[in-house]
Amino acid sequence: MVLFLKVVLVVLVVYLLKMLVLFVLFYREIKNICQKDPAAKNCWEVLFLYQGLHALISHRLAHFLYRCRLFFLARLISQISRFFTGIEIHPGAKIGRDFFIDHGMGVVIGETAVIGDNVLVYQGVTLGGTGLQKGKRHPTIGNNVVIGAGAKVLGNITIGDNSYIGANAVVIKDVPANSTVVGVPGRITRQDGRKIEVSLDHIHILDPIMQSIEELQVRIKKLEGK
């Protein structure tokens, strides 16, 4: 019994020391979350209980290993983090400073995604690709961008600085700086502080799902013709 208590005590001390080191190393990120989330009561709560921070810490380590070409270890850390946090960030993704994932569950960030500084992402966001091509195939997100819950930003596109992507929007084209985008597919409703008139004629609005189906049908016909 005494031996068991000693082991528990040692494990607890090691864990607390590890968390103290993480607090020092990631104080900037912790402070950033405290400033952006009114629900955060203090920095210790953020350090111990915020899965968005845990996913970011894991990604920093995984990305370092990825850059060292230790791909298996990098991916292993990424998968372990995904299991515990519900957030999937490929170790190849490049993420700037003051990045905050609020709530976090279901967030997916692809391998070639690039995220600037001071970006806020809510639950269910996908920064994904649209095909099987190699090379840059995921979005580039500028500085001071907010991406609402459930939004999908797809393909090798750029979201300009100081932009806001509305909840559940599907963005498949470049977005200029200082813009607000909503809807499926995403449409700019405000730019540089000016409201943009949006046509509600859905006949001419591109449906990305139907477009993908049509492309598949064309490929099938080509294969059948061989």
Question: How should these model regions be labeled?
Answer:
Residues I159, Y164-N168, K195, H204, ...:
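Low-complexity, compositionally biased segments
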Residues R82-T189:
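Structural signal for interior beta-strand "rungs" in well-ordered beta-sheet cores
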Residues M1-S81, I196-K226:
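Terminal amphipathic alpha-helical/low-complexity segments used for targeting or macromolecular assembly
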